[in-house]
């Protein structure tokens, strides 16, 4: 299993992002942007000019996690800013199929996100349409929350569905990821870790990233 790590830069030092990107770029696979509008969740983060500026600073792909209402009205702005993958919450759109189709028409990958209390069946029904499924293991809005282990049962159900049908979207988890929770998530079927607080509050980013890979190496799936 090729483990992917997408650092969430919400807790990075934004007064010197070029240095932050330089410190993490060699050890990770993509950059995770937690985009919040102050409506779906309370904080407001990462306006379009900021995203466009960050994309120019870093050669990696940017994974835009839209924690916003009415994502269908705004996705084109994030694509234009440089996002390579856009994932949106099932909880805030009445026609996810149309939005997935629009993302594909624009040439970007489509991801779907569910909160910890959203039935996984809603995501399973669209597994064949997406490149990434994101399971929130905390409630969205703020970094540093405690991991919700019950989410892993939803990951297992999703992975069993995909395995039985030859589907292989990325399975991403976001929230409370550290050296204890990362291998548990990987065992459940996760292959893409979003880690923010664990990386950016460490003294050595490269060491933190390497340690995540190390604890997940050789973990056997239990789904």
Predicted regions span which residues?
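C-terminal helical cap(s) of enzyme catalytic domains, especially alpha/beta-barrels
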Residues: 103, 186, 201-223
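Conserved, mostly hydrophobic/aromatic
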Residues: 17, 24, 34, 78, ...
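Catalytic cores of alpha/beta
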Residues: 21, 72-80, 118-129, 177-192
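Glycine/Thr-rich beta-alpha phosphate-binding loop at enzyme active sites
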Residues: 37-45, 49, 116, 126-160, ...
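N-terminal active-site wall of soluble small-molecule enzyme domains
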Residues: 33, 37-102
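Structural motif
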Residues: 26-27, 57, 81, 106, ...
């Amino acid at each position: 299993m090729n483990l992917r790590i997408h650092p969430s830069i919400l807790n990075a030092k934004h007064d010197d992002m070029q240095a932050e990107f330089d410190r993490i770029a060699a050890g990770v696979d993509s950059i995770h942007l937690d985009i919040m509008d102050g409506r779906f969740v309370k904080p407001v983060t990462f306006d379009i000019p900021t995203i466009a500026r960050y994309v120019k600073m870093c050669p990696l792909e940017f994974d835009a996690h839209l924690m916003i209402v009415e994502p269908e009205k705004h996705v084109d702005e994030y694509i234009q800013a440089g996002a390579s993958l856009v994932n949106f919450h099932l909880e805030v759109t009445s026609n996810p199929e149309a939005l997935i189709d629009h993302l594909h028409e624009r040439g970007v990958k489509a991801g779907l996100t569910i909160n910890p209390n959203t039935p996984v069946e809603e995501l399973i029904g669209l597994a064949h349409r997406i490149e990434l499924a994101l399971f929130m293991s905390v409630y969205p809005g703020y970094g540093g929350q405690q991991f919700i282990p019950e989410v892993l049962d939803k990951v297992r159900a999703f992975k069993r569905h995909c395995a039985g049908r030859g589907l292989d979207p990325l399975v991403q988890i976001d929230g409370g990821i550290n050296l204890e929770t990362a291998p548990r998530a990987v065992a459940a079927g996760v292959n893409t870790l979003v880690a923010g607080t664990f990386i950016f509050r460490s003294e050595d980013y490269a060491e933190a990233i390497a340690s995540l890979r190390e604890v997940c190496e050789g973990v056997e799936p239990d789904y």
